[in-house]
Regions:
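Conserved lysine of the Walker
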Residues: 15
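ATP-dependent small-molecule kinase phosphotransfer cores
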Residues: 35-104
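ATP-dependent NMP and nucleoside kinases share a basic, alpha-helical "lid"
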Residues: 90-142
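P-loop (Walker A) phosphate-binding loop of NTP-binding proteins
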Residues: 10
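Hydrophobic positions on the alpha1 helix immediately C-terminal to the Walker A/P-loop
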Residues: 18
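Small-molecule kinase domains that catalyze NTP-dependent phosphoryl transfer to phosphate-bearing small molecules
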Residues: 66, 130-187, 191
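Post-Walker A helix-loop "phosphate-sensing" segment adjacent to the P-loop in P-loop NTPases
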Residues: 24-31
């Protein structure tokens, strides 16, 4: 079975694009840490809330408007305040099922050093790849839209340990993907 992969980095660096290529070309399945948060949102808000969509909520302090991404961040952090590893515990249940079925997994939403540490405990063979791009390139890719930038999940990844780095600033998607495959297959490819 192929080695599990965790992709870590800022918004717009190319993590999801690389994950989608692993799914398409190598039979991986995306299994995100935030999938559990999405399921909670779907239970409360029938169709869920898209990352860029806005939603008006009533709080004790009054009404507030949040994007779907901000709502996910707040729910994620509120539960992490109770149990730092709660969402990883939820993730590990699904991971175990995939592993037992022989399905390789890519996680493209690793955000915190504690998540990397716990992933390594749960799956010692996992390769953690830092995906990076210059801020201007990321801004352009996201059409200038960043949401939830003040959240720890948007900056916490910087302190996480990783096994390889792919800087997507000046390389093609194909070059970045080739570097990722080389890292997975045992090369120490850093682009």
């Amino acid at each position: 079975m192929s080695r599990p992969v965790a992709l870590i980095g800022p918004q717009g660096a190319g993590k999801t694009t690389l994950a989608e290529l692993l799914v398409e070309h190598r039979g991986y399945r995306r299994h995100g840490i935030a999938d559990g948060i999405r399921r909670v949102l779907q239970m409360a808000y029938r169709d869920g809330v898209a990352k860029g969509e806005t939603i008006e909520l009533q709080r004790f302090s009054g009404k507030v408007t949040l994007t779907g991404r901000e709502l996910m961040q707040e729910i994620g952090m509120a539960v992490r305040d109770v149990d730092l590893h709660f969402w990883l515990r939820v993730w590990s249940q699904g991971y175990s099922e995939l592993w037992q079925a022989g399905v390789p997994v890519v996680v493209d939403d690793v955000r915190l050093p504690s998540e990397v540490q716990m992933l390594r405990v749960l799956e010692p063979k996992i390769i953690v790849v830092r995906v990076h791009a210059d801020a201007e390139v990321r801004r352009e890719r996201r059409a200038g839209v960043y949401t939830g930038n003040g959240d720890i999940t948007e900056t916490g990844w910087e302190g996480a340990a990783f096994d390889a780095t792919i800087d997507t600033t000046a390389v093609t998607v194909q070059e970045a993907y080739a570097a990722l495959v080389a890292a997975i297959d045992g090369g120490s490819e850093n682009v």
